[in-house]
């Protein structure tokens, strides 16, 4: 081959075209032969896996020599073509194109050579645990393979074998790197599956090895740096750090942020640093932000020193790796979750519950700033302000939100508590809240000055007849203890609003309004069944609603001049809620009254219309019905005793007794025939009602004070006097009936109509001339 090239180069003058074509053909055949041998060798090595190292080296030498010959011949041809272009341009061009095709084939063979060399060097580096060098050789082989794939004329079967070989070797080095990583970063967990208990935290450890156990003699950098840099070269560093970051967050950082008694302990030993936990007793229910920041800083500083502060920007054979610091990479991966954890488990619980403590929160804001600055110095964070600091600085909004949330939660708990636990309200009762702050001193002096002037100018403007001091007070009654606490909560919240910022004051004010809206919706629904079945609870609920409505009348006015200016233009009012609460209480009590009326009428329906009282069975049924009615009324009187205000109590009992009496009157006046015995027995039943009826009026627990209301029965029972007249008629003669009618002017005429009186006379007396005369007088 060398003599052939020498002969071509030594030839002087014009080359013979036939001779040149023959030589190029020979060269082409030789290229094809070498190509076949190389492909055969590659196929055997990467597809058939046969040892062929010596033949491969010989082929490499032949390829190099042949490449040099082609370059010399190509140069000579170009020279001859330029000299004799006008003679045989087309022929020389064809020869040149054929030669260029041969050059392409040779370049592909060179790429195969470089691929094979890179794989061989990779294997050597992997054997010597030079992971960075091995990773770089794999990347070189990857580039060679990519270039080969870009040539469509190459054998696809060989490319497939090479690609598979490259994949296998990459997974191989990643496996070895993973093993080295597990030796350098060792997690120790408790045997139990529960990893969220304090006991499991105390058994969790992280071991950071600064050197490998089998230290190599010639290592260009610390082993952990070598492993990380190799991961970086292979493009796997991000996923490896992300996995480490998630475990760090789950097993180290989150427990420190959520458990106040947990503290990190750093143990330094030869070639190893251990991060573990210890428990220190504390009375804190939630961790202090400043303490949590200190704990996390300690852990991150250790990681920064032992793991994250390693150079990844070294140029190795012109192969530049990532210049982003490891700390910043890890920070980007876990900071969002870490800051959310710090907010939910730490900062949220540090928000004050009282506006007077807001000033103390500046310390927490300052510690948050210091924490973030420390992380920025470690390059764990970038320069931008994070959500953590924004959350801490937005304390006014968070305080208002938390306060409002706490108020609503407390209010709802009170609304869903038992209604029957009551307290007595008297006209002098007051809400247990601190005194409201006085208005501005200047305004106070001005008011006093005007008042003194008017006092001296006008001697006495007080009217002769004054109202009672309790005219506008809520009457004595019993309300639920929970409702009293609910009103105290409303007053305390508004009092808090008077010393808060404008934004917070507005939120607190509307939270108080929301309390009453919530009461309107929750209580009737939550206690629906009891309010329907138990008359005492219905009465208490009625009082509760009236009590709230009573306070809502003046609640806004009391705080009007002390709230934020935006609320002082008339919006700070609760008067619009008053009708709704009055209606709520009234409807509930009226529904109970309707239920009681229904029971009374149902009992009286078993009296067999009070007819044929001479029949013992009928009389017994009527007597039983009357006694059941009286018993029901007495039981209601006891249930409502000392609960309802006296006037409401008397009206309610009077209405129910009036219903029963009206039914009795209606049944008796509807009878067509009443014998003497019937009349006597009906009179006896009516007398029972007349004697025991007033006893149901017992609004007060002291029996001596109830006599007044029992004597006023006719005031509350409209049918009481007609009932007495009915009793009189059952025992009276025709003459007595006529006298009480008194030409339509007597008490009987006031109680019954003429038709009703006539019907009773016809039922009571036989048809005689005297009866006819008596009927004639009834007009």
From Swiss-Prot:
The modification Phosphoserine is found at residues 3, 12. It comes from the Eukaryota. The modification N6-acetyllysine is found at residue 777. Residues 2-81 are annotated as: Interaction with ZWINT. One of its GO terms (biological process) is mitotic metaphase chromosome alignment. It is a peripheral membrane protein. The modification N-acetylalanine is found at residue 2. GO terms for molecular function: centromeric DNA binding. InterPro entries: Zw10/DSL1_C_sf (IPR046362), ZW10_C (IPR048343), ZW10_C_2 (IPR055148), Zw10_middle (IPR048344), Zw10_N (IPR009361). Keywords: Acetylation, Cell cycle, Cell division, Centromere, Chromosome, Coiled coil, Cytoplasm, Cytoskeleton, Endoplasmic reticulum, ER-Golgi transport, Kinetochore, Lipid droplet, Membrane, Mitosis, Phosphoprotein, Protein transport, Transport. Residues 14-130 form a coiled coil. Residues 2-317 are annotated as: Interaction with RINT1. It is found in: Cytoplasm; Endoplasmic reticulum membrane; Chromosome, Centromere, Kinetochore; Cytoplasm, Cytoskeleton, Spindle. Its main location: cytoplasm. One of its GO terms (cellular component) is nucleus. It holds the Pfam family Zw10_N. Widely expressed. Interacts with NBAS and KNTC1/ROD; the interactions are mutually exclusive and indicative for its association in two different vesicle tethering complexes. Component of the RZZ complex composed of KNTC1/ROD, ZW10 and ZWILCH. Component of the NRZ complex composed of NBAS, ZW10 and RINT1/TIP20L; NRZ associates with SNAREs STX18, USE1L, BNIP1/SEC20L and SEC22B (the assembly has been described as syntaxin 18 complex). Interacts directly with RINT1/TIP20L bound to BNIP1/SEC20L. Interacts with C19orf25 and ZWINT. Interacts with ZFYVE1. Essential component of the mitotic checkpoint, which prevents cells from prematurely exiting mitosis. Required for the assembly of the dynein-dynactin and MAD1-MAD2 complexes onto kinetochores. Its function related to the spindle assembly machinery is proposed to depend on its association in the mitotic RZZ complex. Involved in regulation of membrane traffic between the Golgi and the endoplasmic reticulum (ER); the function is proposed to depend on its association in the interphase NRZ complex which is believed to play a role in SNARE assembly at the ER. Overexpression as well as silencing of ZW10 disrupts the morphology of the ER-Golgi intermediate compartment as well as the Golgi apparatus and slows down ER-Golgi transport. Belongs to the ZW10 family. This is Centromere/kinetochore protein zw10 homolog. It comes from Homo sapiens (Human).
């Amino acid at each position: 081959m060398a003599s052939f090239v020498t002969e071509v180069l030594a030839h002087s003058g014009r080359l013979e075209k036939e001779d040149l074509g023959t030589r190029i053909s020979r060269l082409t055949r030789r290229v094809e032969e070498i190509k076949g041998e190389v492909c055969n060798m590659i196929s055997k090595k990467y597809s058939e896996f046969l040892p062929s190292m010596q033949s491969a080296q010989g082929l490499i030498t032949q390829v190099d020599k042949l490449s040099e010959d082609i370059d010399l011949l190509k140069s000579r041809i170009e020279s001859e073509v330029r000299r004799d272009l006008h003679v045989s341009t087309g022929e020389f061009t064809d020869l040149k194109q054929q030669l260029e095709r041969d050059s392409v084939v040779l370049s592909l063979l060179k790429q195969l050579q470089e691929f094979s060399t890179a794989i061989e060097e990779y294997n050597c580096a992997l054997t010597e645990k030079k992971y960075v060098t091995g990773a770089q050789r794999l990347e070189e082989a990857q580039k060679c393979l990519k270039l080969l794939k870009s040539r469509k004329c190459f054998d696809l079967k060989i490319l497939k074998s090479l690609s598979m070989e490259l994949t296998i070797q990459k997974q191989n080095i990643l496996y070895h790197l993973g093993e080295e990583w597990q030796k350098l970063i060792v997690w120790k967990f408790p045997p139990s599956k529960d990893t969220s208990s304090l006991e499991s935290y105390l058994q969790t450890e992280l071991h950071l090895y600064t050197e490998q156990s089998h230290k190599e003699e010639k290592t260009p950098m610390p082993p952990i740096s070598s492993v990380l840099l190799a991961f970086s070269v292979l493009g796997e560093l991000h996923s490896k750090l992300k996995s480490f970051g998630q475990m760090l967050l789950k097993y180290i950082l989150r427990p420190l942020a959520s458990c106040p008694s947990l503290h990190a302990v750093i143990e330094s030993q030869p070639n190893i640093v251990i991060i573990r936990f210890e428990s220190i007793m504390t009375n804190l229910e939630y961790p202090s932000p400043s303490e949590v920041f200190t704990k996390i800083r300690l852990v991150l500083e250790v990681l920064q020193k032992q793991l994250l502060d390693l150079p990844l920007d070294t140029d190795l054979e012109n192969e530049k790796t990532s210049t982003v610091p490891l700390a910043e990479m890890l920070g980007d991966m876990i900071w969002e979750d870490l800051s959310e954890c710090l907010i939910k488990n730490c900062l949220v619980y540090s928000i004050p519950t009282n506006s007077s403590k807001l000033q103390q929160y500046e310390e927490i804001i300052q510690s948050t700033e210091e924490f973030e600055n420390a992380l920025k110095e470690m390059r764990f964070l970038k320069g931008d302000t994070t959500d953590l600091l924004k959350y801490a600085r937005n304390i006014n909004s968070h305080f208002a939100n938390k306060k409002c949330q706490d108020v609503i939660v407390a209010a709802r708990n009170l609304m869903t508590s038992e209604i029957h636990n009551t307290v007595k309200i008297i006209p002098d009762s007051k809400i247990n809240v601190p005194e409201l702050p006085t208005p501005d001193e200047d305004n106070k002096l001005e008011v006093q000055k005007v008042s003194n002037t008017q006092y001296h100018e006008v001697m006495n403007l007080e009217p002769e007849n004054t109202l009672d001091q309790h005219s506008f007070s809520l009457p004595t009654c019993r309300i639920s203890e929970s409702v009293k606490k609910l009103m105290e909560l409303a007053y305390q919240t508004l009092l808090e609003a008077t010393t808060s910022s404008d934004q917070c004051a507005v939120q607190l004010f509307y939270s108080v309004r929301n309390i009453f809206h919530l009461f309107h919706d929750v209580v009737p629904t939550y206690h629906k069944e009891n309010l329907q079945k138990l008359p005492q609870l219905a009465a208490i609920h009625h009082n509760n609603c009236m009590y709230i409505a009573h306070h809502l009348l003046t609640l806004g006015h009391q705080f009007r001049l002390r709230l934020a200016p935006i609320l002082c233009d008339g919006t700070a009012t609760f008067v619009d809620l008053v009708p709704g609460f009055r209606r709520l209480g009234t409807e509930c009590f009226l529904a109970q009254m309707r239920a009681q009326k229904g029971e009374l009428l149902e009992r009286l329906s078993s009296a067999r219309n009070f007819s044929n009282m001479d029949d013992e069975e009928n009389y017994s049924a009527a007597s039983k019905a009357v006694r059941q009615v009286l018993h029901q009324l007495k039981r209601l009187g006891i249930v409502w005793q000392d609960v309802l205000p006296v006037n409401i109590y008397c009206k309610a009992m009077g209405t129910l007794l009036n219903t029963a009496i009206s039914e009795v009157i209606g049944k008796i006046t509807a009878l067509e025939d009443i014998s003497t015995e019937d009349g006597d027995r009906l009179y006896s039943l009516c007398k029972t009602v007349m004697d025991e009826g007033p006893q149901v009026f017992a609004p007060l627990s002291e029996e001596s004070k109830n006599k007044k209301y029992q004597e006023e029965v006719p005031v509350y029972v409209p049918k009481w006097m007609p009932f007495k007249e009915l009793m009189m008629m059952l025992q009276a003669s025709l003459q007595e009936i006529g006298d009480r009618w008194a030409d339509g002017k007597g008490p009987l005429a006031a109680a019954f109509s003429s038709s009703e009186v006539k019907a009773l006379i016809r039922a009571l007396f036989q048809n005689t001339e005297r009866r006819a005369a008596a009927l004639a007088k009834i007009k």
